[in-house]
Regions:
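Active-site-adjacent pocket-lining segments in enzyme domains
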Residues: 1-5, 9-104
Length: 104
């Protein structure tokens, strides 16, 4: 499976090529995305204010969401069982002293 992914201003670049017009997506900010992407971006109704979004084979995230972005990519690529990926994510997001050590 091929995926297309963009985080931070790379998600805005996806808007400039029209890749976000038909899918649910996010970016740093809707106004910022519209300014960067210009007239090629017509997907405003599909924008949601969320750390990371996966719709079909396209993954987008804002610049403060590298963990969420990585999690969505790993799930999309099916590199491990989703439960294992979520364990990894929770361990790194919540920290060594809060989350249990993931069992890979």
């Amino acid at each position: 499976m091929k995926i297309l992914a963009g985080i931070c201003d790379a998600s805005a670049f996806l808007g400039t090529i029209g890749a976000l017009n038909e899918i649910v997506h996010t970016s740093n900010d809707l106004d910022d995305l519209k300014q960067w992407a210009g007239s090629n971006y017509t997907g405003e109704q599909k924008y949601i204010a969320k750390q990371a979004v996966r719709d079909k084979n396209v993954i987008t995230a804002n610049g403060t969401a590298p963990m969420e972005f990585a999690k969505e990519i790993l799930i999309a690529l099916n590199v491990a069982a989703e439960e294992k990926i979520l364990d990894w994510y929770n361990f790194h997001k919540l920290g060594f002293y809060t989350a249990p050590m993931p069992q890979m």
